[in-house]
């Protein structure tokens, strides 16, 4: 078990009841996540072959309805995977049957156009972390693992920090506190200079 490193933000003076003020960002980490990412794709035919060659887990579109009927199995799949992709024709079916499970987790599939290689999309997602505040003043995200060097972790943490600051109306003035911690370790408070 390799511990992840997380950065936690507590923000202030932001009205999160207004959805426009909520933070929902995908941040590309310059030094990668430090671990492999599990990506599944709803695909059939040639697209499924391409996705399988890229190392993605394939979910047959004919099983979407069955997954929707078995909520426990759908939850297990949603928790196991980091990201989902889907061929465009299957997006409606996925939304109808699995939206109730994938939506709240922020894991609705990204559509893959017919002319795009799913491996390229998966490669982009492998270095991505999601920062999501929902309606809470405190939120956190993983930005690396203990196996990475201090320089890599610093670059990743700065990428997340800059994206969050960029989304806040008053930048660092809206940050009450910021902590960095390992999965199992104590939190270390960062000094926020306004």
Question: For each predicted feature, which ranges?
Answer:
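Translation machinery proteins
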Residues: 1-47, 70-71
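Flexible, glycine/charged-enriched surface loops at secondary-structure junctions
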Residues: 1-4, 167-177
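Long, charge-patterned amphipathic alpha-helical coiled-coil/hairpin "stalk" segments used as oligomerization
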Residues: 61-167
């Amino acid at each position: 078990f390799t511990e992840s490193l997380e950065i936690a933000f507590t923000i202030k003076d932001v009205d999160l009841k207004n959805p426009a003020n909520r933070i929902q960002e995908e941040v590309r980490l310059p030094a990668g996540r430090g671990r492999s990412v599990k990506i599944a794709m709803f695909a059939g035919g040639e697209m499924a072959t391409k996705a399988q060659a890229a190392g993605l887990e394939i979910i047959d579109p004919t099983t979407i309805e069955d997954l929707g009927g078995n909520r426990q199995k759908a939850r297990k799949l949603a928790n196991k995977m980091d990201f989902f992709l889907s061929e465009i024709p299957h997006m409606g079916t996925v939304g109808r049957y699995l939206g109730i499970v994938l939506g709240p987790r922020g894991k609705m599939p990204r559509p893959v156009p017919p002319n795009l290689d799913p491996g390229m999309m998966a490669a982009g997602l492998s270095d991505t972390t999601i920062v999501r505040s929902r309606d809470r003043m405190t939120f956190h995200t993983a930005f690396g693992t203990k196996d990475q060097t201090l320089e890599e972790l610093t670059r990743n943490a700065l990428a997340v920090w800059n994206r969050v600051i960029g989304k806040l109306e008053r930048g660092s003035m809206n940050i009450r506190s910021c902590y960095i911690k390992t999965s199992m370790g104590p939190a270390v408070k960062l000094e926020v200079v306004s």
